[in-house]
Amino acid sequence: MLFRYLVWLFRFIEVKNVASISLLVIGSIYLTTAISNNISTTISPTTSSNSLTTAISNNTSTTISPTTTSSNYLTSAISTNISDKEEDTPFSTDKTVFDGLSPITLYRAIRSTLNDTMTDILTRPYRPTTVIFHSDTPQPVKNATQGNIIKKTYRQVLTFFIQPNPLFPCFKNHEVFLNLANILNTILCIILIKNV
């Protein structure tokens, strides 16, 4: 039984090899014929290069020089925006801060420790819906529509610290800014929780 199986297997392999070789020969004949028929349709490199040269020569009249109107517009825009440069002292995280602080610098120093969801009332219009995150409450207070009360109190507290005050004659270290930010954050969250 094993001998008959081996004989059948060898015959199958032999037939399979003959069939595969014949298919390979037939395929190579067709491939050779197809290649010989396509010799006349070869692409010469001069044809594409001539078309490219023609396209380049036709486009030479539309070259962009650096002195066109786009650069002039860019120069005028830059010169216009130079006057909008802010002259205040930038806030740094160092232990020492300059004595001459403008109101917007102090405001940004306090705002840097608060959340970005509070509206910048000195530079942008007020958004009536806002979300306040507080360190003591895990859930934010959403859709605070009592915007006028918040804005008024925030401005009053801010002007209290900005104006010359005997309690705070000058701000010289970073811890003062952090304490002020915590005070403002607590006041705002109390107002929100009471009025929402």
Swiss-Prot record:
Protein name: Late protein I196L
Induction: Expressed in the late phase of the viral replicative cycle.
Sequence repeat feature ranges: 28-48, 49-70, 71-92
Keywords tagged on the record: Late protein, Repeat
Family per similarity comment: Belongs to the asfivirus I196L family.
